Amino acid sequence: MNIDDRKAALLARVRDYGGPLNELPVLAQFLAQVMHESGGLRYVREIWGPTKAQKGYKGRADLGNTKPGDGSRYRGRDVIQVTRRANYRALTKWTRETFGTKADFEALPELLSDPGWLGIGAIWYFLAARKDLIKYCREGNIEMVTRRVNGGLNGYQDRLRWYDDCALKLLGFGTVRDFQKSAGLVVDGISGPKTRAALHVALSHVRETPKIEHKPPVMSKAAPVSDISDKAPKRPAQRASDPKAPTPAKQPGWGAIP
């Protein structure tokens, strides 16, 4: 699955199951974190050494890793990596309650590496594991978004760069200078606090979301088959007013993001 296919698959997942992540101010923040965490969608599975840190996952009851091999078995997967048995269990519970799927990520953790599920772990993280993330995204508070995703500010400058790229593409601008000129800002080509604040405001005012530039990929059948369904979830059958039913939105386009 190439990078363009991953972009299309991720956006399709957000469109269908992301609910508030489809709001452009939120989407720009979400994509910035995803692109940094996954190295521009190049890495969707933790490389296992094991390193010294990875060896520390062994026998950690606080992580839910209570059985031999749990550290490797529940290694990081998806565009924002889900790790630990406890989190795979929580993801399973959320997808079942929200979408009615029978997939069991705790029993079959490798399902999270299948293209048919790409992005669902990151969506769960923003909507369920760290519920305050949506509030910070809507406020345009990229520092707090980063702290909640990372636990600190590691790679902060790269996350800012990705935010600039994603926000510009979602708004249809090619460069920072183009946006600054349109927004009546000082045109210096530097994206600082004022430019990012203006990007956030501009995203908040967009009423229609631009269309995706890539066709959705054919989903992989590589995931193991068992009596537990390993298929990607169907759209929720609940009423649109039900808080458990994410509201689908038009698909945005960010194919030009490097």
Per-region residue spans from a language model:
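Acidic helix/loop microenvironments that form the catalytic cleft of cell-wall polysaccharide enzymes
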Residues: V34-E37, Y136-G155, K181-A183, K194-L203
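Peptidoglycan-targeting cell-wall enzymes and recognition modules
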Residues: M1-A9, F30-F126
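Second-shell loop/turn segments in exported
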Residues: M1, D16-L21, Q29, G69, ...
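Long, low-complexity, intrinsically disordered segments
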Residues: D227-P258
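Secretory-pathway/luminal and periplasmic proteins that interact with or process carbohydrate-rich
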Residues: H36-E46, G151-R159, V186, S204-P210
